[in-house]
């Protein structure tokens, strides 16, 4: 094998290695985030559901990244089951006068959603920057 053939093989092997290395995904610190808003949400309003893989140990939370137009909002985390009634995992209140977050801790692998259970100061609430992390 000539020198140019050896160099060609080394270059080809190096390029193939770089393609493989570039295709490897680095795991994220947060498994999932829902960035959304609430417009005139009333008591009983349900967020969309999400699947928590429980692969990262992150505490499930709701956050107001903007102030809202009521005094406070109470959110309840719901653990969804297909074969029995859903489980209520607790209610957390968030003030509307400032940004903030409330946490339910790490949850097991399954489907979840959040429900508005109370609104203080108004009949409905709007939050321009509402987030769920899981």
Model-derived regions: residue spans:
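Post-signal peptide N-terminal regions of Sec-secreted extracellular proteins
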Residues: 29-134
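N-terminal prepro-regions of secreted/extracellular proteins
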Residues: 1-50
